[in-house]
Amino acid sequence: MALPKQRIRTGRRSNPPEPTQGIQSLVLRVLVYGAAICTFAVLLFLIGYILIRGIPYLTPDLFSLEYTSENCSMLPSIITTVEMTLLSLVIAIPVSVFTAVYLVEYAKKGNKLVGLMRLTTETLSGIPSIVYGLFGMLFFVTQLHWKLSLLSGSLTLSIMVLPLIMRSTEEALLAVPDLYREASFGLGAGRLRTVFRIVLPSAMPGILAGIILAVGRIVGETAALIYTAGTATELPSGLLSSGRTLAVHMYCLSSEGLHTDQAYATAVVLLLIVLAMNTISALIARKLTKN
């Protein structure tokens, strides 16, 4: 008679988890969830406080086309904010995107010029905004005789957001798999066609993320614009006319101490504009990702 086969266990028996590991996991989970809840609670508190203080003072007078000391209209500031944001992005986006394309797609690894450009970008991103404002005042306003104007402020803002968009674009391009490039080259496409037809569309969500951050910095900037664009309350008649953005308008109202309620109302509008821009950009990025 054949003896029944016995299973031979060659693997080692896993040791039961120690009690300290369970405690450490629980503590780590509590810390992670606690940090997330605190962050979300602070955000809700800030948004709720601004809305509660500002919504009751959103009157039709605040949206008059002409600013007076009585209505403290923010409509000229809204229009100036849109104009300055668009002009700054028109200047900054092509320069930053093409620079990032050169660094990732064309420059050789270990090139000293690439290292110098990245060092310059990191240095520019760490400079305080007041220094940018001082540079814009001395160069654009005084040296070029453009005075306090939309053009001076927009050029200063474009220099400020240039490192942000460039680094985001560079990271987005590096995230595109090399398989896409190799497949395009295998089909006979050149490098230029591959970059503009394959690489850039694949990296578009990351590029848009950098542009969103740049828009947020432009809309919320005050220090640099006070020195370059001025604080004029009327609508600018041209690129060489002075004007104030929403953030500068809110700063002026709050610093005077006479129109604090209108300053909170301006903060509500500024918050809604930023949320709307972020939502629209996120929807565009999601659509591009699906395509």
Locate predicted features.
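Periplasmic/extracellular loop-to-transmembrane helix junction in inner-membrane transport proteins
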Residues: 11, 15-34, 49-88, 110-111, ...
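Hydrophobic alpha-helical transmembrane segments of multipass integral membrane proteins
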Residues: 79, 83-91, 95, 99, ...
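Interhelical loop and adjacent transmembrane-helix boundary motif
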Residues: 70-72, 225-271
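Transmembrane-helix boundary motif in ABC transporter permease subunits
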Residues: 88-121, 134, 282-287
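Transmembrane alpha-helices
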Residues: 89, 168-169, 191-228
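Generic hydrophobic transmembrane alpha-helix motif, especially the helices
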Residues: 122-158
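C-terminal transmembrane helix and the adjacent membrane-cytosol boundary/short C-terminal tail
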Residues: 103, 174, 212, 255-291
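Glycine/proline-centered hinge or cleavage motifs at structural transition points of membrane proteins
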Residues: 128, 187-188, 201
